């Protein structure tokens, strides 16, 4: 069966949560523009069930992820904390939970290269599947910049239903 046939058999909607990882955002010192953009765009495809801004702290990121999952999210998108500074801990927090890692990061970096050139080596955007006993959740981790989020959303919106179909098999 080809990609188009798989997409026809894919779910038609999903529930999603958004987590913004930002020290300044969590303190109210910086407006979160990326989280609301994700909510706006994914609301065209699914139901928004969770949103939270957390500091760059592993425990806070994990608590928010588990809250999003408990809220019924089939898909969780994080934004922020994917760079290479000491405070960028989103990937280290979430990636160990993945049962399967997707090639999202490679595609994201290829698309980003078209926009920012070699600076794309600074991103560690990733995605993966977390399998529970009764539920499966797809997690995408995007950089915090609005332009990077737009790039990530282009990929997510194109493949999220296809990913959900296969993840649930």
UniProtKB/Swiss-Prot annotation:
It catalyses: molybdopterin + ATP + H(+) = adenylyl-molybdopterin + diphosphate. InterPro entries: MoaB, MoaB/Mog-like_dom_sf, MoaB/Mog_dom, MoCF_biosynth_CS. The keyword Transferase applies. SUPFAM superfamilies: Molybdenum cofactor biosynthesis proteins. GO terms for molecular function: ATP binding; molybdopterin adenylyltransferase activity. SMART domains: MoCF_biosynth (SM00852). Gene3D superfamilies: MoaB/Mog-like domain. Its EC number is 2.7.7.75. Keywords: ATP-binding, Molybdenum cofactor biosynthesis, Nucleotide-binding, Transferase. Homohexamer. Belongs to the MoaB/Mog family. Catalyzes the adenylation of molybdopterin as part of the biosynthesis of the molybdenum-cofactor. This is Molybdopterin adenylyltransferase. It comes from Pyrococcus furiosus (strain ATCC 43587 / DSM 3638 / JCM 8422 / Vc1).
């Amino acid at each position: 069966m080809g990609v188009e046939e798989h997409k026809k058999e894919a779910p038609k909607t999903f529930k999603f949560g958004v987590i913004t990882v930002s020290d300044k955002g969590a303190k109210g010192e910086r407006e979160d523009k990326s989280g609301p953009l994700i909510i706006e765009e994914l609301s065209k495809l699914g139901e928004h069930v969770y949103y939270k801004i957390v500091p760059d702290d592993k425990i806070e990121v994990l608590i928010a992820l588990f809250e999003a999952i408990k809220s019924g999210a089939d898909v969780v998108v994080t934004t922020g904390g994917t760079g290479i500074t000491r405070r960028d801990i989103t990937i280290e927090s979430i990636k160990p939970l993945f049962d399967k890692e997707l090639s999202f990061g490679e595609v994201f970096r290829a698309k980003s290269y078209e926009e920012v050139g070699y600076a794309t080596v600074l991103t560690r955007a990733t995605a993966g599947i977390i399998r529970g006993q009764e539920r499966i959740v797809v997690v995408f981790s995007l950089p915090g910049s609005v332009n990077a989020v737009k790039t990530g959303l282009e990929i997510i919106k194109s493949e999220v239903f296809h990913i959900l179909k296969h993840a649930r098999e």
